[in-house]
């Protein structure tokens, strides 16, 4: 099964990063995302919580129910299945984080399988959020039906960790602005993969065009929105990216720097 995620991030990742908690507050204030409590927890977060509970010693097979609306629904299903004790009590209108705390406070060693994949490399990350009416105003009206399926998480990679790279099945050689054909060679690095590798080691690395003498950062090239790199991201799980252009523009205006996006097929 093909998975399709979209990532929004600074177009100049070597410059000072935006304040990601401030970006989160702006998105909540504008109701681009909704507080992740009660029935506004996205399905992806509910399924991740269920997966983590299913990994407990002695638990039954993984459980998934399309009728789940809250994190408490997930817990109730696992209590009924015998994966959690009958005495466990959680807030019916709480968050996934509230339920995890209640489970652990009950003496159950629930691991971090409910978190998103890159959490261990992060200095900060948000809960998974559902899109709100503010996102509806910024979304492609022809694709608005997809918005309920989005799960949105903000994260910042720790400075001591390698940068995060958005790279997938759709990534291929880029085009230099003003040129008509894809370019494979990027001397002195080698091919475009070698250039990506050099920037992965140092975000400040750029490339000098051998003919024009012009300098290009990695993301100055046209990757047809199939490559991203940096430390600050907003991930739209199950999002394509093409429908987010107005959001990207609004975000750039809000945080005072140009933003871009990339989509990943895997």
Regions found by a protein language model. Give the residues of each.
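N-terminal alpha-helical interaction blocks
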Residues: 1-170
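Generic recognition of long tandem-repeat/solenoid scaffolds
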Residues: 8, 176, 234-236
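Compositionally biased, intrinsically disordered low-complexity regions
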Residues: 40, 119, 134-136, 170-172, ...
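Generic hydrophobic, helix-prone segments enriched in Leu/Val/Ile
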Residues: 23-29, 195-197, 234
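Cys/His-rich short segments
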Residues: 145-225
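Generic detector of bulky aromatic hydrophobic side chains
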Residues: 3, 24, 71-75, 95, ...
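Long, charge-rich boundary regions
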Residues: 200-266
């Amino acid at each position: 099964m093909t998975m399709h995620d979209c990532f929004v991030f600074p177009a100049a990742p070597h410059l000072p990063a935006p304040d990601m908690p401030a970006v989160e507050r702006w998105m909540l204030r504008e109701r681009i995302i909704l507080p992740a409590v009660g029935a506004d927890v996205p399905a992806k977060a509910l399924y991740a919580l269920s997966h983590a509970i299913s990994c407990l010693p002695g638990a039954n097979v993984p459980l998934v129910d399309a009728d789940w609306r809250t994190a408490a629904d997930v817990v109730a299903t696992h209590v009924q299945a015998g994966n959690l004790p009958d005495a466990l009590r959680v807030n019916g209108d709480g968050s996934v984080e509230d339920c995890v705390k209640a489970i652990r406070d009950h003496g159950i060693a629930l691991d971090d399988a409910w978190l998103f994949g890159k959490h261990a490399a992060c200095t900060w990350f948000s809960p998974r959020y559902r899109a709100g009416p503010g996102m509806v105003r910024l979304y492609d009206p022809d694709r608005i039906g997809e918005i309920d399926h989005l799960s949105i998480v903000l994260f910042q990679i720790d400075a001591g960790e390698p940068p995060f790279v958005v790279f997938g099945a759709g990534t291929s050689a880029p085009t230099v602005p003003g040129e008509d054909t894809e370019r494979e060679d990027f001397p002195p690095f080698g091919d475009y993969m070698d250039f990506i590798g050099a920037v992965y080691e140092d975000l400040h690395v750029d490339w000098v065009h051998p003919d024009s003498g012009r300098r290009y950062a990695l993301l100055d090239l046209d990757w047809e929105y199939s490559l991203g790199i940096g430390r600050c991201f907003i991930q739209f799980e199950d999002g394509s990216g093409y429908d987010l252009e107005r959001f990207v523009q609004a975000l750039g205006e809000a945080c005072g720097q140009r933003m871009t996006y990339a989509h990943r097929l895997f």
